[in-house]
């Protein structure tokens, strides 16, 4: 049959018949890991040298996000120069400064310059010292003003406890209620008065702390006197009136 058809066509038919029976060959990859590692590394866009006006993709992303990193390589000398140098005053300098502050809290430029030349300090340091001293003075004044009303309030609240020395305190209205009735005769009233109010009765002012005696002048009580009585047994009004009549 191959002679009739031809040798080329016969070989093709045999090849097709063999391909149907055999398993398909595995596709071979055109690259392998070993081949990739052996290849020379090509430069990427990240490693490409940039011109003075060009920005890399990393820098463009950082600038687009708005995040700026602080410079780490800032010299330490610049940091130290920002710190304020504290001035140590001597005793003589403090004495001169406090003397002027006692005279005036707000010295003008001429006084500050003269004082700075006298104590051998720059005028700016003298001005700063006066500012700090004024702040301390205002703070002390505020503390003093806050403490004064508290002391006054405590003194006003504290009242003397030993006011009643001779006995219970009786007001004038209470004494009027204890007075004998007017229907009794005068002699009975005298007896009641002598029996009811003994001779050792004492008069004390209603508020002893309000009256202060002045040396050389008679004492005048400016408030209503209060009778301090040690009450004796109460007499019976009926028996006294009956005996008097």
Swiss-Prot record:
Residue spans binding DNA: 82-141
Compositionally biased region (Basic and acidic residues): 42-51, 69-79
CDD domains, A to Z: homeodomain
Lineage, opening ranks: Eukaryota, Metazoa, Chordata, Craniata, Vertebrata
UniProt protein name: Intestine-specific homeobox
Species of the source: Homo sapiens (Human)
This protein's record includes keyword Chaperone: no
Region (Disordered): 38-86
MF-aspect GO terms: DNA-binding transcription factor activity, RNA polymerase II-specific; RNA polymerase II transcription regulatory region sequence-specific DNA binding; sequence-specific double-stranded DNA binding
Subcellular location field: Nucleus
SUPFAM superfamilies: Homeodomain-like (SSF46689)
Alphabetized UniProt keyword annotations: Activator, DNA-binding, Homeobox, Nucleus, Transcription, Transcription regulation
């Amino acid at each position: 049959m191959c002679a009739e058809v031809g040798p080329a066509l016969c070989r093709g038919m045999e090849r097709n018949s063999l391909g149907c029976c055999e398993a398909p060959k595995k596709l071979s990859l055109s690259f392998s890991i070993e081949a990739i590692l052996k290849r020379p590394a090509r430069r990427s866009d990240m490693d490409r040298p940039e011109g003075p006006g060009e920005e890399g993709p990393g820098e463009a992303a950082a600038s687009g996000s708005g995040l700026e990193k602080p410079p780490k390589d800032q010299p330490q000398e610049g940091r130290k120069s920002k710190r304020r140098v504290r001035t140590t005053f001597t005793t003589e300098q403090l004495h001169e400064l406090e003397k002027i502050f006692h005279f005036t809290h707000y010295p003008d430029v001429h006084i500050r310059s003269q004082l700075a030349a006298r104590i051998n300090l720059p005028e700016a340091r003298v001005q700063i010292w006066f500012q700090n001293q004024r702040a301390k003075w205002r703070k002390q004044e505020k503390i003093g003003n806050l403490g004064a009303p508290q002391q006054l309030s405590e003194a006003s609240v504290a009242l003397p406890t030993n006011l009643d020395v001779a006995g219970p305190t009786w007001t004038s209205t209470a004494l009027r209620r204890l007075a004998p009735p007017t229907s009794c005769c005068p002699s009975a009233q005298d007896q009641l008065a002598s029996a009811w109010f003994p001779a050792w009765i004492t008069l004390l002012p209603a508020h002893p702390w309000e009256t202060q005696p002045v040396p050389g002048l008679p004492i005048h009580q400016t408030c209503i006197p209060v009778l301090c009585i040690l009450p004796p047994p109460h007499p019976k009004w009926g028996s006294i009136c009956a005996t008097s009549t």
